[in-house]
């Protein structure tokens, strides 16, 4: 397997997005729209998407292979279903398609599995199993386990990174920020102190079919967001203070005054 840096993967994602934008169905769009994984997979990459129950506990979200192979699918009645993957097909868990709350996970899983095919197209001699007489590699996308910060599977990590680049390419994010009135850079994303900016970023995330968390991380990655305080909305200029129990403050000015009182005394 070829080991790629994040910057290398982002460059691949940009190339794929450029080709995607030239597709007839996409080129005629005038407004900023979310990347459509189905058009990307079928019209650009020549892949086919099918839906099946992939496991009894539904913890396998997707599977694919860049070569022809038969895969055994487990059904609820414990019956085994033999499915033939032809090297151009991506299987997605049916429940992801049916549940509207899993729409984001469904989009990501499609692009994750498609990423394996993109790497195979770009690096045919370094990716997958090329030895005759040995079955091709079967890729699985599973329910994520607790993150430890340690990469244990570089192949799946690279597929995750490319999937993120395909769904939120830098060019699309910049265009969306300009269109929605965020300018070239957001100084601080904080729902308490910067509610107007937060509302715009949240609207942009919905436009791009993303969560606000994923969009904020992408913006920060590309230097489009200075301070990401989604998980720290009560941090005032990066300084922390104790919030009394059963606090009902809603006005940022009250929080600011509490910070000033705690730091400098009630007379300030």
Specify the residue positions occupied by each region the protein language model found:
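Active-site hotspot residues in diverse enzymes, especially metal/ion-binding acidic/histidine motifs
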Residues: 1-268
